[in-house]
């Protein structure tokens, strides 16, 4: 689905300047991967590159296989094709942020269904089924402010999966949770991705938690 060869991203200025270099990376259906490292090691930068929200430096190969065709992502960035990149992001990617990233004025049901609505997908049983599987079915009509941090993360996971993406990226999804909730949320995230045959890449500083969840 994603193929990267010799991709580089340089950020910052002066003493804060650094370059992230990706010699080789392939993301394929069904993979369950962990990106482990301390804060500031470039995990979020790599996720933003993979999520097509951050442009790579010139050079290298960056391809995305979607809709039975291979697209040159690096070329799309160079030519300014933000429309094509946005379409790829909305169809192919699901993203779980560290803080959930929910819209406070929408209830849980509409937050989960937002990714489907933006793609014009029909309202079906998907939202309710995900809510049941992620143990938040009794929270559907509440606003995010009324939820615990763990519940908000489960809503974010449901939203990332609701439109049937090929790849789910999660940036420190358990960093703000207590150990018990972190364990449960990580297990639910991996289980739901596995059930759908989705490629999942989780950035985390907790290698032991990632291993217990079955991430490689």
Predicted regions mapped to residue ranges:
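ABC ATPase NBD coupling module
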Residues: 69-94
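Conserved ABC ATPase "signature" region
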Residues: 124-139
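Conserved ABC ATPase signature
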Residues: 143-153
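Hydrophobic anchor residue at the start of the ABC signature
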Residues: 157
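A short, proline-enriched helix->beta-strand linker immediately N-terminal to the Walker B motif
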Residues: 162-166
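Catalytic Walker B motif of ABC-type/P-loop ATPase nucleotide-binding domains
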Residues: 168-171
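Helix N-cap at the start of a conserved alpha-helix in ABC-type nucleotide-binding domains
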Residues: 179-181
């Amino acid at each position: 689905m994603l193929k990267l060869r010799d991709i580089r991203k340089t950020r910052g200025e002066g003493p804060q300047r650094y370059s992230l270099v990706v010699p080789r990376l392939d993301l394929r259906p069904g993979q369950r991967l962990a990106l482990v490292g301390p804060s500031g090691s470039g995990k979020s930068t790599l996720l933003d590159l993979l999520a097509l929200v951050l442009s790579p430096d010139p050079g290298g190969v960056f391809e995305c296989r979607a809709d039975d065709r291979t697209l040159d992502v690096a070329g799309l960035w160079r030519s300014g094709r933000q429309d094509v990149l946005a379409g790829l992001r909305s169809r192919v990617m699901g993203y779980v942020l560290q803080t959930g990233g929910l819209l406070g004025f929408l209830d849980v049901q509409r937050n989960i269904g937002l990714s489907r609505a933006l793609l014009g997908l029909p309202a079906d049983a998907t939202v309710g089924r995900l809510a049941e599987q992620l143990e938040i079915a009794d929270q559907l009509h509440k606003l995010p402010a009324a939820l615990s941090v763990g519940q908000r993360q489960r809503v974010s996971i449901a939203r990332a999966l609701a439109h049937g993406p090929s790849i789910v990226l999660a940036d420190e999804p358990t960093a703000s949770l207590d150990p018990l909730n972190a364990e449960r949320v990580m297990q639910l995230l991996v289980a739901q991705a596995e059930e759908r045959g989705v490629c999942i890449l989780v950035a985390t500083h907790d290698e032991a938690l990632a291993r217990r969840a079955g991430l490689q």
